[in-house]
Regions:
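Sec/Tat signal peptide C-region and signal peptidase I cleavage site
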Residues: 20-24
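Intrinsic-disorder/low-complexity regions
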Residues: 2-3, 19, 35
């Protein structure tokens, strides 16, 4: 009788484990809009971490994967389970002594997704752009070995690219150059600098 009960509990535990396994990779979508509502970011979590950017009804950037590879082999963003979601509106007054205005307001909406394992990602949607950054709450030192940042454009847009003028030391330059006007598919595999 005792063996049957133990066997029954083992089978029940296995069924519960198998039944809940798909929940770990369940895809969940989060939406964040700019203050004026013109830009929208859709963040998807589950098997991976990706985002998509919309302007009105137009897709500007198709779902693009993001993540980090740590020195110990941990993949931040892979099988991402959100443990906390926080939203806030931000209006920062930025002093700009060398700009044509003395100061300006940087307004955005922010979505902070804390991920299981002591990491998180914060997205910001401004009226004229979108940004994200990873962070950690791990107390020990963390070494990032690589970053995954895909940019999947829905079509072959025209790009205005100012390439570096120093191929041997691409960051050792005056950051001044003419713009190469080209479809994204024809962009050169070398460093281009802002503004793009």
């Amino acid at each position: 009788m005792k063996n049957n009960r133990t066997l029954g509990l083992a089978i029940l535990s296995l069924l519960l484990f198998i039944g809940n396994a798909p929940l770990a990779a369940k895809v969940k979508n989060y939406t964040l809009s700019s203050p004026d509502g013109g830009l929208k970011v859709e963040i998807s979590t589950g098997d991976g971490l990706s985002y998509r950017i919309m302007h009105g009804n137009d897709t500007i950037l198709s779902h693009s994967n993001i993540g980090l590879v740590l020195a110990d082999g941990t993949l931040v963003g892979k099988s991402s389970r959100v443990t906390r979601e926080r939203r806030k509106k931000i209006e920062d007054k930025v002093e700009s002594p060398f700009y044509r205005f003395k100061e300006f307001i940087a307004a955005c909406n922010e979505l902070d997704l804390k991920l299981q394992g002591g990491f998180g990602v914060t997205f910001r949607a401004y009226d004229d752009g979108v940004a994200y950054r990873f962070y950690t709450t791990v107390a020990s030192e963390v070494t990032v070995k690589d970053e995954m940042a895909e940019f999947n454009f829905p079509q072959d847009y025209t790009a205005y690219l100012p390439y570096t003028t120093n191929d041997k030391k691409p960051m050792a330059m005056a950051f001044q150059n003419v713009y190469d006007i080209t479809p994204l598919s024809k962009a050169q595999p070398k460093l281009a600098f802002l503004p793009v």
